Amino acid sequence: MSVPPRDVIVIEACVLSLASNVKQPYYLQKAKDWLQNFGTLTLSAIHPSEDIRIDNNLHDDLNKQTSNTPVYFNQVAYLDFAQPIDYWQWLQLTKKFEQQQDRLLYQKPAVTLDVDIIAVKCLHQIDNIDQSLDEKGNRFVLFAKSENQWLGIRRRFPLACYDQVGIVDLSKNIDLSFIRNF
């Protein structure tokens, strides 16, 4: 079975979800140091998943902790790339970086570092984006049609509570209302 050709999606910024439940300060700092190599980085505060409470019960099932579930420490990052990069190349780089963080030394539910793309800001408008698929075969979420359109990674929505908290934190300095209101 052949893989369909992928559209070139050149991005100039992205929003990432970072998470760790093994030596959290160490691995989240490594993520920060690595991401800064690509451009201007803005980070939310770090939030332990057990400390996040929501009032509207929309995502309770996503955030329930059991006594056997290690507490994740979560952070949301906004990265404004110094040089535009192809989405697929960026995705490969983030997954390769994850694997280089001692992930093979631990078994789930222990995770040294997750780096997940939430949304990307495209350099140019993509006319056929409603037909484009991400690496899991899902269509992208189009937040707003504009010269620099933002696309969301569908499987990340609705946002988990820990990502919502990070987005709200980042929104104090960066307009991410299009994600918050989705």
What label would you give each PLM region?
Residues 3-4, 65:
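Short hydrophobic/aromatic-rich motifs at helix boundaries and adjacent loops
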Residues 11-15:
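Extreme N-terminal starter segment of soluble prokaryotic enzymes
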Residues 56, 68-71, 88-91, 96-182:
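Flexible, gly/pro- and Lys/Arg-enriched active-site loops
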Residues 1, 8-10:
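Charge-biased, low-complexity intrinsically disordered regions
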Residues 7-8, 108:
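Short hydrophobic/aromatic segments of transmembrane alpha-helices and their interfaces
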Residues 18-20, 77-83, 119-122:
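Short beta-strand-to-loop capping motifs
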Residues 26-86:
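Short, surface-exposed acidic-centric catalytic microdomains
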